């Protein structure tokens, strides 16, 4: 169980730092067994302990339970009276690196147009591609960082971020560099996904095989070379 916290311990070799969070109003997702996968009716269960404590040792949870069983030895403590603690959210599918918006397409959908109809006239992903290619890397980073901070504030602790709105080597590298910079500047775990093959760019409209070859022989090797 991973729980987001403001108070981070400094971990050194042979050095142990313990932090006790006490008087927790309610501690969620505590289970007797260590199930790594929940499915079906199991997902309806959201176990908790009221009036709880949580003990952290060098950034790892080592103990938790009712306040009546709280440890008496620790290095620092945090009174969490009136507050709840729960594991951070894992957001496994996002497209938060983008430029502009497609709000007009929302109106088009309300008016009855299908996604294919919108796509055929240059909307959908192709609309996002055009805007992203024109945006600077600094602009993309700033806007994406703002979106990421909103997600963190709402409790996200692990996030996957896709590229795929560039559809060219230069634009995809730009997106992946933005994601790498976010990885370096924010404490949450960020996983990058190279997601270019979900649409065909205008320059390869009549040569889809050529686009696949470009991905395999040019894009993937260069992205691997740059460690993105």
Where are these regions (language model features)?
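N-terminal metal-binding scaffold of metallo-dependent hydrolase/deaminase domains
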Residues: 12-70
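Metal-associated gating/positioning segment near the N- to mid-region
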Residues: 80-142
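Short, glycine- and charge-enriched coil/turn segments that flank and shape catalytic ligand pockets
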Residues: 66-76, 185
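Metal-coordinating catalytic core of metallo-dependent amide/deamination hydrolases
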Residues: 128-143, 149, 157-228
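N-terminal amphipathic/basic-hydrophobic helices that include classical n-h-c signal peptides
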Residues: 1-16
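Divalent metal-coordination and catalytic microenvironments
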Residues: 24, 54, 59, 82, ...
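Conserved beta-strand scaffold positions in the cores of enzyme catalytic domains, especially
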Residues: 20, 75-79
């Amino acid at each position: 169980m991973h729980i987001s916290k403001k108070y981070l311990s400094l971990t050194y070799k042979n050095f142990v730092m313990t932090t006790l969070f006490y008087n927790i109003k309610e501690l969620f997702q505590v289970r007797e067994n260590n199930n790594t996968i929940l499915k079906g009716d199991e997902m309806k269960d959201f176990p908790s302990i009221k009036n709880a404590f949580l003990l952290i040792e060098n950034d790892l949870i080592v103990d938790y339970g009712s306040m009546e069983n709280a440890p008496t030895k620790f290095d620092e403590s945090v009174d969490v009276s009136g507050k709840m603690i729960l594991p951070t959210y894992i957001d496994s599918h996002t497209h938060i690196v983008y430029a502009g918006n497609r709000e007009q397409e929302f109106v088009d959908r309300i008016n009855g147009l299908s996604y294919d109809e919108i796509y055929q006239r240059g909307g959908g992903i192709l609309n996002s591609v055009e805007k992203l290619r024109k945006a600077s890397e600094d602009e993309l980073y700033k806007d994406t960082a703002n979106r990421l901070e909103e997600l963190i504030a709402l409790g996200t602790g692990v996030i996957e971020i896709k590229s795929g709105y560039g559809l060219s080597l230069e634009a995809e590298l730009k997106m992946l560099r933005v994601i790498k910079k976010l990885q370096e500047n924010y404490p949450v775990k960020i996983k990058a996904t190279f997601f270019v093959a979900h649409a065909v760019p205008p320059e390869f409209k009549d040569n889809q095989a050529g686009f696949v070859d470009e991905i395999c022989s040019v894009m993937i090797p260069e992205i691997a070379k740059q460690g993105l």
